[in-house]
Amino acid sequence: MGNSFSSVRDTLAHILGAEWIWLERWQGRSPKALLDPAAFPTAQSLKSRWETVERDQLQFIEALTPQRLSEELPYINQKGQRYSYPLWQQLIHVVNHSSYHRGQVTTLLRQLGAEAVSTDFLVYFDEKTKSQR
């Protein structure tokens, strides 16, 4: 369908895998591979793992200090190459990466005739606030 990945599931698994691998890197580990999309045969299995990664991300982010955000954080990518960037830049990279692929998911859903949800950040907060009333 002219996308980076062959399906909605594979695209979502890629987003999840990238968020997971970056969290691992921020904690001093450098996994050699992303999560395998085949490990998520159902939407529920993907959602369950995503909830775990999201919880772990939140714990990590809540503990950050301004000093920690500005520190250079080295990591080794999947090809074995070493890199180092300030943590704040890595965080922005992950947000941008996920946003890019969420846009692809939206396009795929529309091509499949499904109604796509909004990926706007502020719309998310508006809806979240309304649901908490």
Language-model regions: role of each:
Residues 73-75:
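Short acidic-hydrophobic surface loop/beta-edge motif
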Residues 1-36, 78-133:
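Short, contiguous alpha-helical
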Residues 29-70:
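Helix-adjacent hinge/juxtasegments
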